[in-house]
């Protein structure tokens, strides 16, 4: 048995409800970092089919999810093709039904409202049944409360919740957030990460601050 979880394994534990997400993704426009997991008691491996909605890669939008993210059951990402044309009199998608309708009203991607990519940082916790809309960027260390609808960007290490999701609080002070962003613990090799785990799980933020400062000092001296 390996000393550390294998990021290339679909099911990292014996429960079968949690999968390391990058290993079940096939769409060319979806990227998921190491150790990010999706938890679902039914079919966690069907994430791409059930949780990434209206994903048409030819549309050009990307879904990028960082490392060590915790994605709860029912979280969904609404991709750009979900948006209807709003610049014309009717918003109805006539062309998708084929035949004469498609000939008379051919689809024009440039007429659709383009919101851009969905980008989720590292160590982000997305609560159960939350919905992330097109064009949203969620920063490192952020938390999205259960059943929230995220319509706008979320700053690193903040907590948002509601429909639409609103700022609830900043998790830490600016200095500690800057330290975390500089250390970027999610990029450490497994051996170094294991040594840092007591710090990452310590509620004593003063001790955490000292430890992270020491990490940066050691890096600067090598």
Predicted regions, residues:
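Flexible, glycine/small-residue-enriched loop-and-beta-strand segment within the central core
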Residues: 20, 30, 37-132
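Beta-rich strand-turn-strand
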Residues: 118, 129-142, 150-151
